[in-house]
Amino acid sequence: MLTCNKAGSRMVVDAASSNGPFQPVALLHIRDVPPADQEKLFIQKLRQCCVLFDFVSDPLSDLKWKEVKRAALSEMVEYITHNRNVITEPIYPEVVHMFAVNMFRTLPPSSNPTGAEFDPEEDEPTLEAAWPHLQLVYEFFLRFLESPDFQPNIAKKYIDQKFVLQLLELFDSEDPRERDFLKTTLHRIYGKFLGLRAYIRKQINNIFYRFIYETEHHNGIAELLEILGSIINGFALPLKEEHKIFLLKVLLPLHKVKSLSVYHPQLAYCVVQFLEKDSTLTEPVVMALLKYWPKTHSPKEVMFLNELEEILDVIEPSEFVKIMEPLFRQLAKCVSSPHFQVAERALYYWNNEYIMSLISDNAAKILPIMFPSLYRNSKTHWNKTIHGLIYNALKLFMEMNQKLFDDCTQQFKAEKLKEKLKMKEREEAWVKIENLAKANPQYSLCSHASTVSMPLAMETDGPLFEDVQMLRKTVSDEARQAQKDPKKERPLARRKSELPQDPHTKKALEAHCRADELVPQDGR
């Protein structure tokens, strides 16, 4: 008979009847022995599968015995899937032990870059060399957990906190196939062992804390969040305080990490699940997102806009009122972003019917915040697609409340006139300074070295519409044109940036001459 003994972190297999090197034995099929002997043979096969083979340094070694183990694992998967009353009490410790021997191991150091440099679409993950055996061990253990014969009361002696902790450590594996099996395995354990649920949540929290505040690298964050999404969905109401703390202190800080793109869809799902459970959490969640809003990372900003729209899709009108002003101040900044994808994603909010109904109910607060940004960028944004989306948003605002739209237009004009007057005062102050400088007796000595010129303002808002009726007509026409344009097939062509024209810059460029034109040439 084969026995498996622990020696440190390695499993050493002994053959009781052999003095030479260990040789696995191809045992009979379980179905070929009498029912009375099947349990004994099942245990022998489980112990036989405790043998570990080298797939890394010498992949071609022991090919015969690797196949013996693979065949034994495949047979056991079929055996517990298609037979009832075969998971008896003596089987439990053998199954858990066999799983632990094969799976619980020290993971190799990461071969890919960490943090923001890691690109899951470009960087190839390191695949587990022993996967032909590991896959079957995972499949067998899952069938074991899912079997109608499985009894958690017996299994809890062997599937304990230590087992769960070692299982969670494997989530850092680079092999996505292994992480997928781990995700399903941990979810089954969470569902069947009520006494382990709080411990599992606590240990996942610890992994997230280390990831956020220490390492910023972990391969299994997306899978752990996917498990949590299912767990959150099952939380009873009202939510416990520990669950609210988990949202505010663990999930929301995950938005800070550079590698957010790797797990953002799963994170956004978890956040939205919480808000569907308890709408009073909306304000702290949105304010935290605004606090963590990316300043210089445009792709990450697009992710935040995606998540924010998902939140607005489930928000209660009473909660929307609490966050609308800081939220739309941020959206106004996004509309003004020179990165066209950020501006475009923000303007797509105006295509969402539920969001538009919320805006309509609170237009008196929202339109004054958004109008200056929309108007300015309708003239000056370099991307023509953005112009069309802005005119569409302005048209919707105009149809929503025409009087308010006209008031915002007049207010914007008044503010622009104030700015121009202020700029004129500054220019006059500079003229006075220049005149005082000219009155200085030393002025003539240094005037040839430098020329004092007053600062010049660059008009970036385009010409103001003097007539509100003209603005209305322009907005309607441009919005109508923008709806037609996307349907046209446009030829691929290199587009030149369209920047605001500053006449003073133009004159300075025309007056500019190269340094060698000023230096006298020999013989001239």
From Swiss-Prot:
GO terms for biological process: signal transduction. This is Serine/threonine-protein phosphatase 2A 56 kDa regulatory subunit gamma isoform. InterPro entries: ARM-like (IPR011989), ARM-type_fold (IPR016024), PP2A_B56 (IPR002554). One of its GO terms (cellular component) is chromosome, centromeric region. The keyword Nucleus applies. It comes from the Eukaryota. PP2A consists of a common heterodimeric core enzyme, composed of PPP2CA a 36 kDa catalytic subunit (subunit C) and PPP2R1A a 65 kDa constant regulatory subunit (PR65 or subunit A), that associates with a variety of regulatory subunits. Proteins that associate with the core dimer include three families of regulatory subunits B (the R2/B/PR55/B55, R3/B''/PR72/PR130/PR59 and R5/B'/B56 families), the 48 kDa variable regulatory subunit, viral proteins, and cell signaling molecules. Interacts with SGO1. Interacts with SGO1; the interaction is direct. May interact with TP53. Keywords: Acetylation, Centromere, Chromosome, Nucleus. A motif (Nuclear localization signal) lies at residues 472-489. The gene is PPP2R5C. Highly expressed in testis, heart and spleen. Also found in brain and skeletal muscle. Residues 476-524 are annotated as: Disordered. Gene3D superfamilies: Leucine-rich Repeat Variant. One of its GO terms (molecular function) is protein phosphatase activator activity. It comes from Oryctolagus cuniculus (Rabbit). The lineage of its organism: Eukaryota, Metazoa, Chordata, Craniata, Vertebrata. The B regulatory subunit might modulate substrate selectivity and catalytic activity, and might also direct the localization of the catalytic enzyme to a particular subcellular compartment. The PP2A-PPP2R5C holoenzyme may activate TP53 and play a role in DNA damage-induced inhibition of cell proliferation. PP2A-PPP2R5C may also regulate the ERK signaling pathway through ERK dephosphorylation. It is found in: Nucleus; Chromosome, Centromere. The modification N-acetylmethionine is found at residue 1.
